């Protein structure tokens, strides 16, 4: 157990910091102090995460580290349990990094800035808390904690149909949370003299195969909404299409990863027998999702909806990697989650920049803005190349691991592997079609005279917006050139889980 409560400080710091925002002064009705204060808290939080993990985490140790355990409700063994291992060591800093940049992207927000920035900090706390939770009921509470600020961010800032999108989001996610809670309590309290909610103790328990299957499915419903997995994905395009682009960065960069993390942390690690049964279906659904979402993306007029379907397609690789149950495949899935956290957040920032100048999200109302916005065009092109897995980018490193991951799986027949590989390849071929066509519609050709004439005189990205893009681009290229930067953190844990359970 850790001698100093590093993780507790990291998880709880944003909440009191957010509660102080209403007390901050706002000279002349401005929000400058609020913006800088929130950015400072996010940066401090990110530096705390970086310091803690750099100086107190052993990458060769597959067990839980920096463990903190404080009694809460002892009768059901509900404790404040935190810790990190190879599964969470990458996603937690990613949360801090993307949230800090999203706060910077939210600079133009002027409507109810106190509530907006307080909600961002509350969401920050919930997501970091989920990735560090070592108690299954605490995991559920953190899962629920981020729903409220996300709903506020969606319902109050965004497009004309933002209330519809926010309501759809809360119905889907709250509906998925019900089986998550039932499964968590059943797993912790069923059939043993001493109830336990501790992940470490739950990993050593065994359940009747029928119960394990029911538990697996109950958890899977919640993760299928968050990841998202077809057919529970329809909330995501609506949400991205209406949300403020800084909120979209948080959704694409972090929130989707909560589903993949839960699938590994609980379903794969705690319910290995059921996972072996459902793994082929994960692979099949993942392969279908890659092609389906890529096909639908090309028909989207709204730039943010097109990027949203791109995210759904890329999450298919995560499903295939998890379903492969191989070292290289699972490492590829984890790398894909981190890679997409960077690559998925950046296009929304750039789409927001384009919207701020053109006042339209529709691709057929843009056209030709590349001449007046060359910096935005360059960055958009760079991240489009990363999204279609150009060699030298993190997307290429992740997807090139998922392919051999499924091929090397011993539990699948040769025809199955060939079919899945062909479907994956089709999805990869479709990716440049919808991405490059989006670039063509936005930046090439002639100005659309039907739309706002100010498009031809649109101002290019400023220093703040370029800084956000560069901060996301550098690790994208760095991980692509040296993927061991991430793989060295999670490989020991992956090997341990696979050797003990599969």
Swiss-Prot record:
GO terms for molecular function: NADH dehydrogenase (ubiquinone) activity; ubiquinone binding. It comes from the Eukaryota. It catalyses: a plastoquinone + NADH + (n+1) H(+)(in) = a plastoquinol + NAD(+) + n H(+)(out); a plastoquinone + NADPH + (n+1) H(+)(in) = a plastoquinol + NADP(+) + n H(+)(out). Pfam families: Proton_antipo_M. One of its GO terms (biological process) is electron transport coupled proton transport. It is an enzyme of class 7 (translocase). Its main location: plastid. Keywords: Chloroplast, Membrane, NAD, NADP, Plastid, Plastoquinone, Quinone, Thylakoid, Translocase, Transmembrane, Transmembrane helix. PANTHER family: NAD(P)H-QUINONE OXIDOREDUCTASE CHAIN 4, CHLOROPLASTIC, NADH-UBIQUINONE OXIDOREDUCTASE CHAIN 4. This is NAD(P)H-quinone oxidoreductase chain 4, chloroplastic. It comes from Huperzia lucidula.
């Amino acid at each position: 157990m850790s001698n100093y409560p590093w993780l507790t400080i990291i998880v709880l710091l944003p909440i009191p910091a957010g509660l102080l925002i209403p007390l901050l002064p706002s000279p002349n009705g401005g929000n400058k102090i609020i913006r800088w204060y929130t950015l400072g808290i996010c940066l401090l939080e990110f530096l705390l995460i970086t310091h803690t993990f750099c100086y107190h985490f052993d990458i060769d140790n597959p067990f839980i580290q920096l463990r903190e355990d404080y009694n809460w409700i002892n009768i059901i063994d509900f404790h404040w349990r935190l810790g990190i291992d190879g599964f969470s060591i990458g996603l937690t800093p990613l949360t801090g990094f993307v949230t800090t940049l999203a706060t910077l992207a939210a600079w133009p927000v002027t409507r109810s800035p106190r509530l907006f920035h307080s909600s961002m900090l509350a969401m920050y706390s919930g997501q970091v808390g989920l990735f560090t939770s070592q108690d299954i009921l605490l995991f559920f509470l953190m899962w629920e904690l981020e729903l409220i600020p996300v709903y506020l961010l969606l319902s109050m800032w965004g497009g004309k149909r933002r209330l519809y999108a926010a309501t759809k989001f809360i119905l889907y996610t709250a509906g998925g949370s019900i089986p998550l809670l039932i499964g968590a309590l059943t797993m912790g309290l069923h059939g043993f003299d001493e109830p336990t909610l501790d992940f470490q103790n739950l990993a050593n328990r065994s359940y009747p195969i029928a119960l394990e299957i029911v538990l697996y499915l109950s958890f899977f419903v919640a993760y299928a909404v968050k990841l998202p997995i077809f057919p529970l994905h329809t909330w995501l395009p609506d949400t991205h299409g209406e949300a403020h682009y800084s909120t979209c960065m948080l959704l694409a960069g972090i929130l989707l990863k909560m589903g993949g993390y839960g699938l590994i942390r609980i379903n794969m690690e705690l319910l290995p027998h059921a996972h072996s049964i459902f793994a082929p279906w994960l692979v099949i659904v993942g392969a279908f999702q890659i092609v389906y979402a890529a096909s639908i993306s090309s028909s989207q007029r709204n730039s943010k909806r097109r990027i949203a379907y791109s995210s759904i397609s890329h999450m298919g690789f995560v499903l295939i990697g998890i379903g492969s149950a191989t070292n290289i495949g699972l490492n590829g899935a984890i790398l894909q989650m981190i890679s997409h956290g960077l690559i998925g957040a950046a296009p929304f920032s750039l789409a927001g920049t384009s919207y701020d100048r053109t006042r339209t999200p529709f691709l057929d109302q843009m056209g030709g803005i590349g001449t007046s916005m060359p910096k935005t065009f360059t960055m958009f092109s760079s991240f489009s190349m990363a999204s279609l897995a150009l060699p030298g980018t993190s997307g290429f490193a992740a997807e090139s691991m998922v392919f051999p991951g499924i091929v090397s799986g011993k539990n699948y027949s040769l025809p199955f592997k060939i079919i899945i590989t062909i479907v994956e390849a089709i999805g990869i071929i479709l990716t440049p079609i919808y991405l490059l066509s989006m670039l063509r519609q936005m930046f090439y050709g002639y100005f659309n005279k039907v739309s706002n004439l100010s498009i031809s005189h649109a101002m290019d990205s400023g220093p703040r917006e370029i800084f956000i893009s560069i901060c996301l681009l550098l690790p994208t290229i760095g991980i692509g050139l040296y993927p061991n930067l991430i793989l060295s953190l999670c490989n020991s844990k992956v090997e341990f889980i696979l050797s003990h359970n599969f």
